[in-house]
Amino acid sequence: WLVPERAGPGPSDGSSLVWLYHSHVHAPKDSNAGLIGAMIITAKGKTRPDGSPTDVDREFVTLFNIYNENQSWYFDINMKTYLRATNRVDTNDLFFIESNMKHTINGYLFANMPLMTMKQGERVRWYLLGMGSETDLHTAHWHGNTVLFHGHRTDVVELLPASMKVADMLADNPGT
């Protein structure tokens, strides 16, 4: 798979950037079923043999998204598998609809995502993705550490639907 140079970092970018892939075949059903992800493009000549950028020690990819299980390919299958009396469920009930809206980071709910650990002094690159609809307004927030984002130091990066952002961190505050 060849990536044209124009898809990679430009003169004002770091050594790598992120693109968001999602299906346009049966959207939003495909995206709500998980057919979504990141493509990281690193500038030619700035990669290690494994493809990672030479100017960072660790990379993290985070996708902030509200998955709408009501609009997933798996909705009917899950209803039949996990509910005994599907005919008693009002799928138009607002509480039922909201109960199937899954607020996630990388598809994980309720703080059950594996820890993203780093060592003090490591140069960490964060690839931040936001996807969804007008309700998907997210903020990536780091407690005790900051990132460099577009030349500015911050501890919060806003993510709107269909946004792709890269932030660099020097992990300097252990234990947070």
At which residue positions do the language-model features occur?
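Copper-binding active sites and cupredoxin-like electron-transfer domains
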Residues: 1-176
